[in-house]
Amino acid sequence: MEADGLSTTMEEGFKGLLRLMGSVKNYDWGRSAKESCVGRLYRLNSGRKIDEKQQYAEFWMGTHDSGPSYIVEEGGRIQNGYANGGGVRNKSTLKDWIEKNPSVLGETVLSKWGTQLPFLFKVLSIEKALSIQAHPDKDLAILLHKEQPLVYKDDNHKPEMALALTEFEALCGFISLEELKVIVQTVPEIVEVVGNALAELVLDLNEDDEEEKGKLVLRKLFTEIMSASKDVITEVLAKLISRLNIKNKVRELTDKEQLVLGLEKQYPADVGVLAAFLFNYVKLNPGEALYLGANEPHAYVYGECIECMATSDNVVRAGLTPKHRDVRTLCSMLTYRQGNPEILHGTAINPYTMRYLPPFDEFEVDRCILPPYSTVAFPSAPGPSMFVVMGGEGTMTTSAEVIVAEGDVLFAPANTNITIATSSGLHLYRAGVNSRFFEE
């Protein structure tokens, strides 16, 4: 049975809620089972025991083949509504189900993206920094997938947004020209790698120069660092760490310097440790978000977050990772824009819900925190929605009432009115197609 008591082959006009089982990723940078929000969510969502020896990094909700969501039927939460982990996974994926029931996406979404769910929804638990990476634009994604399908597994672009659940740290985009000059003047190890001539080019730049000139110099600088030999990087990092440890005895290190020391412990002799000086070091409080367009460098450093993106798993990596590195592609694809990223604080759409709208058609995210004995309405949207319950319990009502609790994941078709209520408090997130897309 489905969440509303219907079979997995739905009639046209289905307006219920479809309960899902997500996929988990056990990457090295994730948090231990006991400390990981992802591990807890996966245990509650799937009813499976978690491996205490594993790191739990990502919980995926969507249709991507690398981590599909499955329809849940019979038993457990489906029959009695409670979080006892007894749900049975159907053989049908959400992707299969949508292809059989395309009307659930809504006419506007179907005409733009076909039967593909436009967004991929995730929860991340980060203990150790992720790789310095960027996601290709649509044209580059098509090319990379064609040339290296085992590495780049689809042909879609991957703009994304991270919404902090806890205090959250990230490297995001290149620092301003003014900050870059300070780095060149105060981090001699960078000059040792790139040479005095290139360092002088940076210092000679000014705000009146054409933007493309600045981008060209920054590209040369970044490429020289990322392309340096392992021996050179090992040598200069040893000098850097020694210098910072000595400085730490006479003055308090800057946040960036402390970050670099921490990264070196996680990734000894890795070029990404030195490259970190070139990026904005961003700290988010819970409820704050940052977004990343195609071809923008970034590395999540620490914390837990909700993440939403276009449906893709394409990542070009070049530092802070044991995985495949593609330095040439990364250095050639970046925009080399400089300056601080925009931090989103959300816009209130009702007393309990904040909406985060990045400049991408594929997705938006709502953060809903209901106090005890409260009710909120999610009016029908022209596109589909995905909900994940992060805490508490309550009910979600469409054509029928469904009891929900922490770990539940539900898919709502387009044009579905939903009322959410709780007597004890409820914390959930919704992903949907960007509402601005429907206003165009």
Predicted regions and their residues:
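Transition-metal
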Residues: 1-249, 322-340, 365-367
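Contiguous mid-protein beta-loop-alpha structural module that forms a pocket-lining wall or clamp
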Residues: 203-324
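His/acidic/aromatic-lined binding-pocket segments of jelly-roll/cupin-type domains
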Residues: 122-123, 130-131, 160, 281-282, ...
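Conserved short histidine dyad/triad with adjacent acidic residue
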Residues: 349-352, 364-381
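A short beta-strand-loop-beta hairpin characteristic of the jelly-roll/cupin
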Residues: 69-75, 94-110, 114, 173-176, ...
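Ligand-binding loop in jelly-roll beta-barrel domains
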Residues: 116, 124-129, 136-139, 154-160, ...
